[in-house]
A protein has these predicted regions:
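Active-site pocket-lining/capping segments in soluble small-molecule metabolic enzymes
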Residues: 1-60, 64, 78-252
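A cross-taxonomic marker for long C-terminal extensions/tails that follow the last structured domain
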Residues: 73-74
């Protein structure tokens, strides 16, 4: 915060014990930092008390849900990972005044959460005595298909996409839709450089095509943007000269 950053504390997406409930209450009652609520229990703790962010795991897919949250104090919402540009345009047209929109723009997508830790299980250890072995797998454990293609990444309690969601080429469309904030999920290396590339495109000092070319060697796997274009999530699409879409072959 001293460096001019807006610090946001996130609540857990999966509450499964009294200790988790205690942590939830501590985070939502911190009294200093903005809180991102990632389930409706957190929303209940925050409603009417302080402005908050509705995280992507609140699963806000329609205008009635977004409008219901507005008087409770939501100041920003993060769209679900599967939401595409066409659906977002509908919600943006009826977005409550004063509510910002944030889009997950880069990173492996968190697709599901489990009460069990996959990394601990992989090492034949219980979750409560995991010895923090996830440190040995900073970008998670890659799961491949029988055809030896990257399919998912297991990272602690998260199941993530093997490919990296990348909306850097789509920044102009994000801006035209009135998106206020882009979310970049950190990786074990090169995150600072990736943020700088996005910053350059947003500020207009870099073209999207040049920045995307510089981004490729910094990514831990091939990219994808299918969800954004209303296609299967693992696919990559780009605009053609006629304003349509054409598929791009991405290899892991």
């Amino acid at each position: 915060r001293d460096a001019g950053k807006d610090v946001v504390l996130s609540t857990q997406t999966l509450i499964e014990s009294s200790a988790d409930v205690s942590t939830l209450h501590k985070v939502t009652a911190n009294g200093e930092f903005t809180v991102e609520a990632n389930d409706m229990g957190a929303v209940h703790c925050l409603e009417g008390k302080v402005p908050f962010v509705a995280g992507p795991h609140c699963n806000l897919y329609n205008l009635p849900a977004l409008q219901w949250l507005a008087p409770l104090g939501v100041q920003r919402w993060v769209i679900p990972l599967e939401m595409g540009a066409a659906d977002l345009a509908i919600l943006q047209a009826g977005r409550p005044p004063g509510v910002q929109t944030e889009v997950f723009a880069y990173g492996r997508m968190p697709l599901a959460f489990s009460a069990r830790c996959f990394t601990a299980r992989y090492n034949n250890l219980p979750k409560d005595d995991c010895q923090f072995l996830c440190i040995a797998h900073p970008d998670g454990l890659l799961l491949r298909t029988r055809e030896n293609e990257g399919f998912l990444v297991l990272n602690g309690i998260q199941t993530q996409s093997a490919k990296v969601y990348n909306l850097l080429p789509d920044v102009a469309q994000l801006r035209s839709l009135g998106v206020d904030v882009l979310r970049i999920s950190p990786q074990s290396r090169h995150t600072g450089e990736i943020v700088a590339l996005f910053r350059g495109v947003v500020d207009g000092t870099l073209s999207a095509s040049d920045a995307n070319a510089q981004l490729q060697p910094l990514m831990p796997a091939a990219g994808c943007n299918g969800y954004w274009h209303g296609k299967p999530g693992m696919e990559t699409w780009k605009a053609d000269a006629q304003g349509g879409l054409q598929p791009v072959l991405e290899t892991a």
